[in-house]
Amino acid sequence: MVQGKFKVLDSDIHIIEPPDLWPRYIDPAFRDRAPIGLTEDEGDLRLAYNGKGWGRVAIDADRSRRRQGRNYALNQERWRPYAERGWTSKVQLEAMDIEGIDVAVVYPSRGLFALTIPDMDPPLAAAMARAYNDWLHDFCQENPERSEERRVGKECRSRWSPYH
């Protein structure tokens, strides 16, 4: 993958977290309050929390943009195979290979909204950040031989408990 003498770095690669990330990874004491990812569109980034939706759908999946052209349908088809495979770490590594990317800094997508839910109490926010970080660690272990040098996960931090 190395292009000449240089490695190709994607400094801002995003993953789409599984809808059940927080129920699966959060401390059991918070499991009944954990948000769940919504999946109405191929790139749905929203969360359900306390019976309400939070976040937004991916830009290309934004329903208000459907009338503005064909991009919505094209992108739904483009991303469908990845969504059907669960946006897994293996899928991410394949995409990096297709694009010729050697190293990537991995950022959240759905996780960007997780800690912005209004009125979330600090202990829950800290538990959600830990759950995301635990999941991200597992995500980056798909191929341990490549993970150390190929992907760096950008951890999630709760603003109320940034070091936990």
Regions found by a protein language model. Name each.
Residues 1-157:
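Helix-coil boundary/capping segments in enzymes
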